[in-house]
Design a protein with these regions (language model features):
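A basic, amphipathic helix-loop patch mediating RNA/tRNA/ribosome contacts
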Residues: 1-42
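C-terminal structural segments of small proteins and small subunits
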Residues: 52-81
Length: 81
């Protein structure tokens, strides 16, 4: 999960992504995720809490690299903000 968050550019570093997961700021399919190494699959619904906002998104792809922002945007669709 930390790698996907990094590929999709929701976190600047994987360490920040790992920290967000372990602190409970990320949910996967409505369940709190305990480990940053949790598997993310296409079609999963992810809930991100950050800066007083909650964002719901659907995973559309699994990135192979941390590419430019337009490429990262193809990995998800925002369901609700």
């Amino acid at each position: 999960m930390d790698k996907w968050l990094w590929h999709a550019r929701f976190c600047k570093t994987r360490a920040i992504a790992q920290d967000k997961v372990t602190k409970g700021h990320i949910r996967l399919n409505g369940q709190r995720v305990a480990k940053a190494s949790a598997a993310v699959r296409i079609g999963d619904v992810m809930t991100l809490a950050s800066s007083g906002k909650v964002v719901y998104l659907r995973v559309l792809g699994l990135g192979l690299r941390r590419g430019p922002a337009p490429e990262a945007r193809t990995l998800y669709e925002i369901i609700e903000e």
